[in-house]
Amino acid sequence: MRCLAARVNYKTLIIICALFTLVTVLLWNKCSSDKAIQFPRRSSSGFRVDGFEKRAAASESNNYMNHVAKQQSEEAFPQEQQKAPPVVGGFNSNVGSKVLGLKYEEIDCLINDEHTIKGRREGNEVFLPFTWVEKYFDVYGKVVQYDGYDRFEFSHSYSKVYAQRAPYHPDGVFMSFEGYNVEVRDRVKCISGVEGVPLSTQWGPQGYFYPIQIAQYGLSHYSKNLTEKPPHIEVYETAEDRDKNKPNDWTVPKGCFMANVADKSRFTNVKQFIAPETSEGVSLQLGNTKDFIISFDLKFLTNGSVSVVLETTEKNQLFTIHYVSNAQLIAFKERDIYYGIGPRTSWSTVTRDLVTDLRKGVGLSNTKAVKPTKIMPKKVVRLIAKGKGFLDNITISTTAHMAAFFAASDWLVRNQDEKGGWPIMVTRKLGEGFKSLEPGWYSAMAQGQAISTLVRAYLLTKDHIFLNSALRATAPYKFLSEQHGVKAVFMNKHDWYEEYPTTPSSFVLNGFMYSLIGLYDLKETAGEKLGKEARSLYERGMESLKAMLPLYDTGSGTIYDLRHFMLGIAPNLARWDYHTTHINQLQLLSTIDESPVFKEFVKRWKSYLKGSRAKHN
């Protein structure tokens, strides 16, 4: 190079170097363009989603979520699913594979000699679109993002088995009911202002009181009370002398009256109010932005109302919920929601969940389901009272689980008929081949869950009105379905307690096990003498369950009932949420009965959730 530099002018040398660099760059670019662009391949469990599969998975994600949401029922707890984020970056298979150099090609896939779908071939591997796999094999999957990367998650089932915390006791948590939220179900029209319990629209838009739903409402709040921390409670009014140092937040317009007066029946002071219906009413500023369970003691002397003004997430608009002294169920007009709470001419406590009352009012419809709404309260602004009456103990709290539990317990006591049952006043058609159940039928599941509720109320209060009601509830267990009871006999040998006392018998599994749990609660609580009948019914039922469990095992899942045996039709396979309910129930029973059969079935049925199958011949 030094020899060349000595003989060549430096300007010529610069030109030669520049030409050499240009040639090098051109050759480099040409070589790079001839190479295929390779993308790093990420491993995934399950079926790969490439190209059009990704677009299909994204477009089907909403359908997937809607399908899972439909798995709700009064018997099985619906599982919440994480919604997959949308997937971007899909491309045409032919163009995409050429541009990006992917090693797959499109291939026709003939399905069962019936129809053809488009798949992907990569060497000896063939990939089918997951939208087809999902429907064909009844499996589930979604694309999720972790740290900015997409990952496809595949699952054989969508429902979850809850671990049994400890041996079951009649005064403890009821199964996994602390996870139930009965009042938010779209088939709950509202929480009745008069009764304080949910009104169901599951089988009719007119609404009716469904004992199973009411018992579940009580048991869920009882269980939440045991598993959640104590609520925060803000006291706004007690009418006592110690409140004199607090600022007077009551506004009393002209023509209205309010004063502290002594109530001899309560041995305390209360707030007396007089406010004509045509007036603005007397009002108490609240201003709570954290909690939305309001409670107050109330006694009306005339017709009246107590209204709560809410600031909402709906463009900060104000909505008012009116609790009125009439029997109207619920009404909604513009930004006013009305709940009838009855005359209330004697002292009673009104406890309302303002979130539920707001959303049920705004979502009010004439169909079976409440319309979905995103509206939420942001602030409890003030309380307004009209008419003539008395108020006391105005509070706002995080939760009021025991108020809900006792509302359900008291309803069960008040509405039990002379035969010991809770008649269901709506027609129920279980399926083709079964006679319709006309209004007034009993359900063993309702009897069992009601007993479990009443036993807990008795254990808390020692009030025998609850225990006596639970004892009377065993009567329908003793009578056959055609005798207006809930009993069926399988193969003239095994006693069974019917969730739906149909003709012919249906032998629904989960409802039967709930009826047994109720009998167990009662026999353990009532003692040797009073619990004798419950013990006998329980023992006969457990013998039947142990003998008949194999009839509900398909080798890959479970069966909801025995209609295939009774009617000679196709079996009614249990959805995954019912399957996990079966497992949860058996887990509970395995803690109170040492028979190994329950643990064996739990182990096998759990494996079905992961895709295991029984061996073939």
Curated annotation (Swiss-Prot):
Outcome after substituting residue 500 to F: Mildly decreased enzyme activity
UniProt-annotated binding residues for substrate: 180, 185-187, 202, 210, 213, 216, 429-432, 499-500, 510, 514, 560, 563, 572-581
Reactions the enzyme catalyzes: [heparosan-N-sulfate](n) = [heparan-N-sulfate](n)
Keywords linked to the UniProt accession: Calcium, Glycoprotein, Golgi apparatus, Isomerase, Membrane, Metal-binding, Signal-anchor, Transmembrane, Transmembrane helix
Ranges in the topological domain labelled Lumenal: 29-617
GO biological process: heparan sulfate proteoglycan biosynthetic process; heparin proteoglycan biosynthetic process; negative regulation of cell projection organization; positive regulation of cell population proliferation; positive regulation of SMAD protein signal transduction
Residues at the site labelled Critical for catalysis: 180, 187, 560, 578
EC code: 5.1.3.17
InterPro entries in the record: C5-epim_C, C5-epimerase
Protein family per UniProt: Belongs to the D-glucuronyl C5-epimerase family.
Protein name: D-glucuronyl C5-epimerase
Protein's organism: Homo sapiens
Gene: GLCE
